Amino acid sequence: MTYALFLLSVILVMGFVGFSSKPSPIYGGLVLIISGAVGCAVILNCGGGYMGLMVFLIYLGGMMVVFGYTTAMAIEEYPEAWGSGVEVLVSVLVGLVMEVGLVLWVKEYDGVVVVVNFNSVGSWMIYEGEGSGLIREDPIGAGALYDYGRWLVVVTGWTLFVGVYVVIEIARGN
């Protein structure tokens, strides 16, 4: 189970390296959709069945619409792939070498530690017994998103609105 999560995380980062190397919008959209699907698999592997399904449906559904529109607007006769230009190829290779180096370093020195600790987990308990508590990940994760991360939800919604407005203005030609 740990190796599956580790492999999914490596594939996720390699997908982001492939996207950040700025290939043609066709290939960039494809890699971002694949990375989103792998990210949903990471969420499913960590026990968030409901959250993984919602992210898959909402995120990837929206991404397919946006990248379908982007691909139609930015169609190229000869799209730039990862091996077609020296700059793109070098950036992908540098990213992959850094990722492989990080994987080997983590495997050799066992340098993975927990970065985030929750201080008030007691308020998230669904059932508390004698010295133990039951936490269900799915409803607690959605509840924590809308309770403790309410400003993050507002900022995310505003960012999506501004992004749609910018795309509409660019498509209009102003």
Curated annotation (Swiss-Prot):
Catalytic activity: a ubiquinone + NADH + 5 H(+)(in) = a ubiquinol + NAD(+) + 4 H(+)(out)
Sorted UniProt keywords: Electron transport, Membrane, Mitochondrion, Mitochondrion inner membrane, NAD, Respiratory chain, Translocase, Transmembrane, Transmembrane helix, Transport, Ubiquinone
Cellular localization per UniProt: Mitochondrion inner membrane
EC number(s) recorded for this UniProt protein: 7.1.1.2
An example Gene Ontology molecular-function term: NADH dehydrogenase (ubiquinone) activity
Bilayer disposition of the protein: Multi-pass membrane protein
Taxonomy, superkingdom: Eukaryota
Transmembrane regions listed in the UniProt entry: 1-21, 24-44, 47-67, 86-106, 111-131, 151-171
EC primary class: translocase
Gene Ontology cellular component list: mitochondrial inner membrane
GO BP term, pick one: mitochondrial electron transport, NADH to ubiquinone
InterPro entries: ComplexI_Subunit6, NADH_UbQ/plastoQ_OxRdtase_su6
Function: Core subunit of the mitochondrial membrane respiratory chain NADH dehydrogenase (Complex I) which catalyzes electron transfer from NADH through the respiratory chain, using ubiquinone as an electron acceptor. Essential for the catalytic activity and assembly of complex I.
Similarity-based family: Belongs to the complex I subunit 6 family.
The protein's assembly and partners: Core subunit of respiratory chain NADH dehydrogenase (Complex I) which is composed of 45 different subunits.
Name recorded for this polypeptide: NADH-ubiquinone oxidoreductase chain 6
Origin species: Pongo abelii (Sumatran orangutan)
Name of encoding gene: MT-ND6
